[in-house]
Amino acid sequence: MSSTEEKFSLKEVLVSFKACLIDDDKDVILEHYVNGWKGLVRFMSSLGTIFSFVSKDAVSKIQIMESYLAGPNGERYRTLQSMVEYELSSDLVDLTKRSDHTDSGCRTLLRLHRALRWLQLFLEKLRVSNEDSKTSTLCTEAYNDSLANFHPWIVRKAATVSFIALPYRNTFFEIMNVGTTEEVVAMLGESMPYVTKVYDFTQEVYSQHNLLELP
Ligand code: 1Q0
């Protein structure tokens, strides 16, 4: 294990979502947003190969976003607002049916954005849970109230079956590498408001531009 992996803690990942917010919480820096997701996927990998079908999809979406960020128009992808303005004004988004721009930044980020809602619900449930709470139940409830609404039956089935393999709450908290249960709860209480702000702001921008149903 490398030294960076040893130090890996969920707190550092959630801090990326704090670093996202600029201009009085009126914009989101995409580089930090993507880094937050990279950290989350790394965390998910430590839960075992059962989630590899999830991480594969998440990694491919992260890579799409990274290629835009590092590409010739990278500056246009610096923030959420600049990406939306650039892609819409340059006709780079398939609005009703996937055709010429199957992997626009807008549709790719929308998938991550929907997953962020799951994360928000799941972590909040974990924060207020007690020792007897089952992580698989919390995760399933969070999923059913968010991402599941956008997934076909077969994906929902695969996802809910994989949740059964989630470790107990204590093990989960240990993997987070934050400290005692009290410290985990405090850390979640401190960082979740930033995740919520990022989620709410993204939702607002997508809603304003009618982008919430991108194919
Ligand atoms: C901790 C357990 C992880 C459970 C992850 C829950 C999400 C289930 C999602 C199932 C996704 C199935 C794969 C494919 C889906 C795609 O069809 C779909 C749509 O994309 P497209 O291109 O076909 O239109 N993709 C998505 O919906 C994106 C899904 C991304 C999910 C990313 C999840 C990353 C998870 C990180 C785990 C963080 C753990 C947090 C720490 C917990 C602390 C205790």
From Swiss-Prot:
Q: Which BP terms in the Gene Ontology apply to this protein?
A: ceramide 1-phosphate transport; ceramide transport; intermembrane lipid transfer; negative regulation of autophagy; negative regulation of interleukin-1 beta production; negative regulation of NLRP3 inflammasome complex assembly
Which positions bind an N-acylsphingoid base 1-phosphate?
A: 57, 61, 107, 111, 151
Task: Output the superkingdom of the source species.
Answer: Eukaryota
Localisation per UniProt entry: Cytoplasm, Cytosol; Golgi apparatus, trans-Golgi network membrane; Cell membrane; Endosome membrane
Which SUPFAM superfamilies is this protein grouped with? Glycolipid transfer protein, GLTP (SSF110004)
Q: Which GO terms describe its molecular function?
A: ceramide 1-phosphate binding; ceramide 1-phosphate transfer activity; phospholipid binding
Q: Name one Pfam family in it.
A: GLTP
**Listed GO CC annotations:** cytosol; endosome membrane; Golgi apparatus; nuclear outer membrane; plasma membrane
Specify where it is mainly localized. cytoplasm
Keywords, in A-Z order: Cell membrane, Cytoplasm, Endosome, Golgi apparatus, Lipid transport, Lipid-binding, Membrane, Nucleus, Transport
Q: Which reaction does it catalyse?
A: N-(hexadecanoyl)-sphing-4-enine-1-phosphate(in) = N-(hexadecanoyl)-sphing-4-enine-1-phosphate(out); N-(9Z-octadecenoyl)-sphing-4-enine-1-phosphate(in) = N-(9Z-octadecenoyl)-sphing-4-enine-1-phosphate(out)
Q: What is the protein's known function?
A: Mediates the intracellular transfer of ceramide-1-phosphate (C1P) between organelle membranes and the cell membrane. Required for normal structure of the Golgi stacks. Can bind phosphoceramides with a variety of aliphatic chains, but has a preference for lipids with saturated C16:0 or monounsaturated C18:1 aliphatic chains, and is inefficient with phosphoceramides containing lignoceryl (C24:0). Plays a role in the regulation of the cellular levels of ceramide-1-phosphate, and thereby contributes to the regulation of phospholipase PLA2G4A activity and the release of arachidonic acid.
Task: Name the protein family.
Answer: Belongs to the GLTP family.
- Annotated protein name in UniProt: Ceramide-1-phosphate transfer protein
